[in-house]
């Protein structure tokens, strides 16, 4: 970086332990600085006179990340990964985020070939409030069929869920959305828009319970509810018939009809090889159920 008059020499970035950099002094229209990072990527930082900062990083594999941050705190990040998938995250000055991602045919094909999920090139932060939860619009290639997709989440927990936003505005928790170490995973059959929420329940009797993570997982998805808004009763027992019903509900089985309330769930469990259908009234611990489902 060239020294500014009267300010003395500015040390080279490499001498300070970072990558090399070059640029020009501040002008009425702003400043531009380019840095070569230790991993070989190159970052170009442009600062406009109004305080807007645009940072663009180009990696050795050709992928790029461009983030524009305005003085009011709003920002837009655009990503294109090496497979050709793209993603954009817009965050307004109040912190409300919306994201869009288009997954490339190459990314989908490679993931399916390896038995993996396609990771979307966006990252959002889950919210406990549906009104402020980030929305993510996911575009899949035509004729992609059922595709496992991972949406990176900065604060993922066992109670983090994807919520499907239908075209009419109604919302539905995706029961099979699964938290991973750094994302939420769901299976999609075509393009869709989802919200990412922390739907964990605050049960006072599970805060220090050994099955807390499992209980957070199942209660957030409505698979096993508490006996009230604040009590889960993890040590209470339930029956095998109730467990069959929970499992069938998790898999969206049709449980209408039947001569007794659990008959359809019992038949479903037998058909799937989950249970022999015996002893429907035998007891099982609610904490054990949660762990089994988790």
Model-derived regions: residue spans:
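Solvent-exposed serine/threonine-rich low-complexity stretches and specific carbohydrate-binding patches
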Residues: 173-179
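Long, contiguous ectodomains of secretory-pathway proteins
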Residues: 1, 5, 23, 36-172, ...
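N-terminal propeptides
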Residues: 158-167, 183-294
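Intrinsic disorder/low-complexity segments
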Residues: 8, 14-16, 83, 98-100, ...
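Positively charged, hydrophobic/aromatic-enriched amphipathic segments
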Residues: 30-32, 37, 218
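Glycine-centered loop-to-beta-strand initiation motif
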Residues: 95, 179-184
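Short, polar/proline-rich extracytoplasmic segments that appear immediately after membrane translocation
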Residues: 3-30
